């Protein structure tokens, strides 16, 4: 009887830590796959570019993109830690003209060659103004599974969910020089809500022209008053 009781106690001593690990693991998985509601700012719905992923902007660099933009571009690289929300969102409204999955290596997500060597998916989007954007889901050393639901020909809206990269990864966004960039290196961003830039529109062009015309007129008025 004593032996049986000892075995029962011993089983519970083992079962306690195992149960704790199981509950902790389940809690982490539920936390990792959380998908909070996000609403883009009202002034970003038409011509804004929002962050396609949660994380930190680790680099903003100039480069040439022969794949889709076919010219000079500025690349915004966002690193996602395992604690960030990993649901990805479309950066701007428009039509998906390019969608391709590329198998590859699993370098750490912040490696300079990760965007060229790692497993990734690439999406080219044309905004209604004609401006083109390219964004890439890039797997890291831990994240080895990319999921997305975008196809060529899809019409998408700013901030719409489109996929996930699991357990630490990176997102690259390439924009042409004409885009007014707001992103800063080191900035912490949230997918679907943080505005990274703005696409030039005919309205913004007319506004700039009007301001440029008004400035000389004001100067002329001051000179006339002085004389």
Swiss-Prot record:
Binds 1 pyruvoyl group covalently per subunit. GO terms for molecular function: phosphatidylserine decarboxylase activity. Its cofactor is pyruvate. GO terms for cellular component: plasma membrane. Pathway: Phospholipid metabolism; phosphatidylethanolamine biosynthesis; phosphatidylethanolamine from CDP-diacylglycerol: step 2/2. Its EC number is 4.1.1.65. GO terms for biological process: phosphatidylethanolamine biosynthetic process. The modification Pyruvic acid (Ser) is found at residue 169. The record marks 168-169 as: Cleavage (non-hydrolytic). It catalyses: a 1,2-diacyl-sn-glycero-3-phospho-L-serine + H(+) = a 1,2-diacyl-sn-glycero-3-phosphoethanolamine + CO2. It is found in: Cell membrane. Residues 206-227 have a biased composition (Low complexity). Signal peptide: none annotated. The active site is at residue 169. Is synthesized initially as an inactive proenzyme. Formation of the active enzyme involves a self-maturation process in which the active site pyruvoyl group is generated from an internal serine residue via an autocatalytic post-translational modification. Two non-identical subunits are generated from the proenzyme in this reaction, and the pyruvate is formed at the N-terminus of the alpha chain, which is derived from the carboxyl end of the proenzyme. Keywords: Cell membrane, Decarboxylase, Lipid biosynthesis, Lipid metabolism, Lyase, Membrane, Phospholipid biosynthesis, Phospholipid metabolism, Pyruvate, Zymogen. It is a peripheral membrane protein. Residues 197-227 are annotated as: Disordered. It comes from the Bacteria. Pfam families: PS_Dcarbxylase. InterPro entries: PS_Dcarbxylase (IPR003817), PSD-A (IPR033175). Heterodimer of a large membrane-associated beta subunit and a small pyruvoyl-containing alpha subunit. Catalyzes the formation of phosphatidylethanolamine (PtdEtn) from phosphatidylserine (PtdSer). Belongs to the phosphatidylserine decarboxylase family. PSD-A subfamily. This is Phosphatidylserine decarboxylase proenzyme. It comes from Salinibacter ruber (strain DSM 13855 / M31).
